[in-house]
From Swiss-Prot:
The chain crosses the membrane at residues 487-507. Glycans are attached at residues 56, 73, 89, 182, 352, 427, 433, 457. This is Fusion glycoprotein F0. Residues 103-127 are annotated as: Fusion peptide. Residues 508-538 are cytoplasmic. Keywords: Cleavage on pair of basic residues, Coiled coil, Disulfide bond, Fusion of virus membrane with host cell membrane, Fusion of virus membrane with host membrane, Glycoprotein, Host cell membrane, Host membrane, Membrane, Signal, Transmembrane, Transmembrane helix, Viral envelope protein, Viral penetration into host cytoplasm, Virion, Virus entry into host cell. Class I viral fusion protein. Under the current model, the protein has at least 3 conformational states: pre-fusion native state, pre-hairpin intermediate state, and post-fusion hairpin state. During viral and plasma cell membrane fusion, the heptad repeat (HR) regions assume a trimer-of-hairpins structure, positioning the fusion peptide in close proximity to the C-terminal region of the ectodomain. The formation of this structure appears to drive apposition and subsequent fusion of viral and plasma cell membranes.
């Protein structure tokens, strides 16, 4: 039993390093689905493949005349003639016709394009530009035609690699040429007719879009693989220098082919292949996760974490990969789409359950189980888990968010009537009793609309009640404010009156005192005057 609890490519130098803890996350319903290597690609160069459509057959002592080859040659000519004519119309417009246009000095037959978009016109320009290389490769048609090898590499004048492929030559070399002198001509002709007929069927399927317009309908590498047959890996490895397998590159659709020339006399076809440049970031993993519901705090919840995470060393980012091409083991992107994660999210990914956030689920929810490497991870508190072999119900304790069911506990499992065969052992070596606080559960995406509407209505009624109380308080405050203003005004007026009265009294006191002083002086003068008069009389 292999334990794989943590994914961390870098070495944890510091104690605070954070890695994706697969084991803990699985116990709360966050299950790892796929781990892919991150690679970057760009279209940088082109290569050419010369497909030799008619095999070489060694002469025999019986001087057999193979009618199947003659018929195959005729049928193939009818198939390729429209393609050759179409390419000729695009690359060589009639000198007397004005229906052509120049792009960067290149003449293109507009009539051959028909109604074309900008991308299709660009493809036509590429088709015309490829003619120089195609003619250089076609100049070696004699050496290509004479070879009896299934794959034949040549170098043309611009030092671009050209691979001559004879798609059915491998079958002819290994099976038929060894039996030419030991079997009758009729039997050999029948065998050859069968092989050529099957191959012709493939050609018809592959080149059906190109019968309309090769400039507007590029050959996908998947169709080209059918055309090249068993030689596809050799061709891919010769044109693309990388350690990634040919199957990964082809399935990602990173290579496309376009017919640039057809040589009917030699039954040769030159296909231009756009070869990408691929760079792999060795320490970068893109991990896909699948979330199922879990039983937390006596209710069904689901963890709030991204579906895809990029891990480089001990750092994690959210990675949407919206413009990337995914295969089984690789993810090919033209640029890095990483988005920062919050510290709480990083801690949650590292297995710190106290930092995780869950959203409650109301109503029916279908994502309650997932198949994982031959085992089943299910929320057996929200659906019925019944083991049929041996027969017993599976109970999930309150302290378990989900239940992992492997071969040791059950061989045939029924989940709400769906039967599954368990074929593997779980790689989890331990399980924890989870403790999650109520504050970690939020309501982000309610499903039971009627319940939520009832809550909204209740909230509105409470709001109306509070508004009425508020209005009453405002009215009370308004009346009180008026009374208070009157009292304040009266107090101010009273104070002013008192001040004025005091000032008046003070002024009256001063005036009275001054009058008394004047009267005293007058009386004193009168007394002196009387004394003087008496003295004079005496």
């Amino acid at each position: 039993m292999k334990a794989f609890p943590v994914i961390c490519l870098g070495f944890a130098i510091f104690s605070s390093s954070i890695c994706v803890n697969i084991n803990i996350l699985q116990q709360i319903g966050y299950i790892k689905q796929q781990v892919r290597q991150l690679s970057y690609y760009s279209q940088s160069s082109s290569s050419y493949v010369v497909v030799k459509l008619l095999p070489n057959i060694q002469p025999t002592d019986n001087s057999c005349e193979f009618k199947s080859v003659t018929q195959y040659n005729k049928t193939l000519s009818n198939l390729l003639l429209p393609i050759a004519e179409n390419i000729n119309n695009i690359t060589s417009p009639s000198p007397g016709s004005r229906r052509h246009k120049r792009f960067a000095g290149i003449a293109i037959g507009i009539a051959a394009l028909g109604v074309a978009t900008a991308a299709q016109v660009t493809a036509a320009v590429s088709l015309v530009q490829a003619q120089t290389n195609a003619r250089a490769i076609a100049a070696m048609k004699n050496s290509i035609q004479a070879t009896n090898r299934a794959v034949f590499e040549v170098k043309e004048g611009t030092q671009q690699l050209a691979i001559a492929v004879q798609a059915i030559q491998d079958h002819i070399n290994t099976i038929m040429n060894t039996q030419l002198n030991n079997m009758s001509c009729q039997i050999l002709d029948n065998q050859l007719a069968t092989s050529l007929g099957l191959y012709l069927t493939e050609l018809t399927t592959v080149f059906r879009p190109q019968l309309i317009n090769p400039a507007l309908s590029p050959i996908s590498i998947q169709a080209l693989r059918s055309l090249l047959g068993s030689m596809t890996p050799a061709v891919v490895q010769a044109t693309l220098s990388t350690s990634i397998s040919a199957a990964e590159i082809l399935s990602a659709g990173l290579m496309e082919g376009q017919i640039v020339s057809v040589l009917l006399d030699e039954m040769q076809m030159i296909v231009k292949i756009n070869v990408p440049t691929i760079v792999t970031q060795s320490n970068a993993l893109v991990i896909d996760f699948y979330s199922i519901s879990s039983f937390i705090n006596n209710q069904e919840s689901i963890i709030q974490l991204p579906d895809r995470i990029l891990e480089i060393g001990n750092e994690q980012w959210r990675y949407p990969a919206k413009n990337c091409k995914l295969t089984r083991h690789h993810i090919f992107c033209q640029y890095n789409e990483a988005e920062r994660l919050s510290l709480e999210t990083k801690l949650s990914v590292a297995g710190n359950i106290s930092a995780c956030v869950f959203s409650s689920i109301a109503g029916s929810y279908m994502r309650r189980f997932v198949a994982l490497d031959g085992t089943i991870v299910a929320n057996c508190r929200s659906l019925t888990c019944l083991c049929k072999s041996p027969s017993y119900p599976i109970y999930q304790p309150d302290h378990h968010a989900v239940t992992t069911i492997d071969l040791t506990s059950c061989q045939t499992l029924s989940l709400d009537g769906l039967d599954f065969s368990i074929v593997s052992l779980s790689n989890i070596t331990y399980a924890e009793n989870l403790t999650i606080s109520l504050s970690q559960t939020i309501n982000t995406q309610p499903i039971d609309i009627s319940t939520e509407l009832s809550k909204v209505n209740a909230s509105l009624q409470n709001a109306v009640k509070y508004i009425k109380e508020s209005n009453h308080q405002l009215q009370s405050v308004s009346v009180s404010s008026k009374i208070g203003a009157i009292i304040v005004a009266a107090l101010v007026l009273s104070i002013l009156s008192i001040i004025i009265s005091l000032l008046f009294c003070f002024w009256a006191y001063i005036a009275t005192k001054e009058i008394r002083r004047i009267n005293f002086k007058t009386n004193h003068i009168n007394t002196i005057s009387s004394s003087v008069d008496d003295l004079i009389r005496y």
